[in-house]
Amino acid sequence: MTRLSTSIMASMKKTATALTLACSVLSVMIISQTQAADNIDMTFQNVLQQERSWAGLQSKSLKVGDVTWSYSEGGSTTKPTLLLINGLAGSRDNWNRVARYLTTNYHVIIPDLPGSGETIVPQDFDYSVPNLAEKLRRFVEAANLKGPIHIAGHSLGGSIALLYAGQYPFETKSLFLVDSGGIFRSANTIYLKDPAYLKQLLVSKKGDFNYLLKQTMFNPPFIPKEFLQAQEKLMIDQAPQTQKLVDQLIALNKVYTPDSFAVLTKTIDAPTLILWGKQDKIINVEVASELKRLLKNAQPPVILENVGHMPILEAEQLVMQQYLPFLLKVETNQSSKTTTP
């Protein structure tokens, strides 16, 4: 296992940087187009849009069947494609700080999963992980993303990435799993042992957002009161959809066991990078080693010291110190295979 130190990540970055990070944290950004936003909401949205632009991303939408996808896209379509998948109660904007390192040399696609962000689904939508993976596949096809593609998933997004790679092995060039969800023998947090406890992380009333930050991040950033209230309000509005996702995770845990989950993961042979925050309170760090044992072609896990469940927000520079060389290695190996007579 590789261990890295964040070297005083709390060396308080400038207020603007902290604010940008804060606005990304677990952002759930559904706002009805017919709903009038107040000044704080508009400022909040403007900050997120500026962050996307700073990362080289543009906001787009695409209707595929009964899902109207909201997604960010950046980089040249002639470059290798990366698909980044957000976690529970997250959104595409969770990846912005990572994406700015990627859009120069890669074609980056970051959708809002159904149930998060601005993606629109019917009231009776099936939020099960298998259906999310299938809908994501339909999105990839409709967006004309030429495979195989690199796939990265954080938390719940990791579970979806694993299922996607298992179902579509020839369309998966590599996997990057960040504090990935799943069903594990080494589960040692209340949220893994009994997913019903995930309901405690729902932001359904005032004060819940502060609790969520403390549970998911080792060193939560400062958030100005006005922006905290705006973020909390948006997440409260999103709570019914998040609740449906949690209900599906509870149901999944009753159907699948660590053994059946292992059967899936053992079929995956895509090159895999596993990265974890050592202080993750949601999915304990021991899971990283279990995933390494299950996956055929995984590198030794990278463990980040003084980081919680959100490395892509808490320590994006350390994340990219690992991910960029991994991507280059995969691309180089593939090129050598295609040029070998």
What spans do the regions from the language model cover?
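Alpha/beta-hydrolase fold catalytic core
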Residues: 2-18, 23-81, 104-106, 328-341
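Active-site loop/oxyanion-hole signature of alpha/beta-hydrolase fold enzymes
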Residues: 65, 72, 110-152
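Conserved HGGG/HGGXW glycine-rich cap/lid loop of the alpha/beta-hydrolase fold
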Residues: 73-118
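Flexible "cap/lid" loop of the alpha/beta hydrolase fold
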Residues: 166-167, 173-205
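Conserved alpha/beta-hydrolase catalytic His-Asp/Glu region
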Residues: 188-192, 203-266
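Short alpha-helix in the alpha/beta-hydrolase fold that links the catalytic acid
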Residues: 261, 270, 284-292
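Short beta-strand/loop motif that positions the catalytic acidic residue
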Residues: 268, 274-276, 280
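Catalytic active-site module of serine/aspartate enzymes centered on a nucleophile-bearing elbow/loop
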Residues: 298-341
